[in-house]
Amino acid sequence: MSETKRKSIFGYCMYDWGKSAFETSVTTAILPAWFAALFLEANGLTGTVIGMEMTSDAAWSLAVTLGTLMVAIVSPSIGVIADRKRIKMVALKWMTWLGAGSVSLIALAPVFDISFQWVWIFVMFLLANIGLNAAGVFYNALLPYQGEDHEMDEISNKAYAYGYLGGGLLLVAHLVLLFTTDFALWATQVAIGSSGIWWFGFAWYTFAYVAEPEIENEIENLNIKDATKLGVSEVFNTLSEWRNFKTLFIYMLAYFLFIDGINSVTSLAGAFGIAVLGLTMGELIMTILIIQFVAFPAAFFFTLSLIHI
């Protein structure tokens, strides 16, 4: 393997290492408890969110849903742009700025009045989710350029393993910080803010080592309007031919249900643990840590299994 290719794969994996801090420390372990406490203090058991009465865990679910839905709506357009123009790395940087920047800004919630703190977290968390999901479109589009077809599983699993380890290591540091300060407010702010810095900081390996892929038949001057038309038409053309690819269609449908189920569990597990199971933040963090350090070697095990099958 050439040095350039090795660095490119390393840079690709380091993006997962960085952004997993948001998915573990922020989305699952720390922020749900902080959000629930602020929501309860400001509103009581229920509050009004965009005209609807909601509990804290329902409001949290709404933020996750809106972030995912917004990206899903524009995915055909940005997917076409990613495939037809050499902007994958540029767009990945933009979305990382949005996601990581919004995460760090969550830490500023205490500067506002108590009635607005949970609203600030809701908005910043929504923007962070949009950044994460949109970045995922361009990040995943880079995978086929990191190696040959037979190497895709190995590279993908390696990136997952890096993500579990990176997110787990930062969560250990956050656990030590929070326990030694008796969960002081400033410690919570540092934990949240550092997650955004961790995400963007390690993403620089990706920006430095992963090159913008070449594209055959690049479309010049492709704007959002044209990309939307092209993206929607390609989606409908593909769906109209599903009978010719029944096995692939069933696989895609099954994968859609499977991966959305996984993403829903990981995004809402923290809120569920706090609001329904009554876990403390410390208990929730310990649970997530166990999961992270079981998943890390498991991802490498699957990689080795694929190599020898």
Q: What are the residue ranges of the model-derived segments?
A:
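C-terminal ends and interior cores of transmembrane alpha-helices
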Residues: T96-S115
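A single, central transmembrane helix in multi-pass transporters
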Residues: L239-P297
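Juxtamembrane intracellular "pre-TM" segments in multi-pass secondary transporters
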Residues: S2-F10, P213-Y251
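Short helix-capping/hinge motifs at transmembrane helix termini and TM-loop junctions
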Residues: L40, A109-I114, L143, L178-D182, ...
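Substrate-agnostic recognition of the 12-TM MFS/MFS-like secondary transporter fold
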Residues: G11-T28, A63-V80, I87-G99, W120-F183, ...
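Conserved small/polar residues in nucleotide/adenosyl-binding loops
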Residues: I307-I309
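Short hydrophobic/alpha-helical segments at membrane-entry points of transmembrane helices
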Residues: S115-M124, I250-Y251
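Short amphipathic helix-loop junctions that connect adjacent transmembrane helices
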Residues: V26-S56, S267-L284
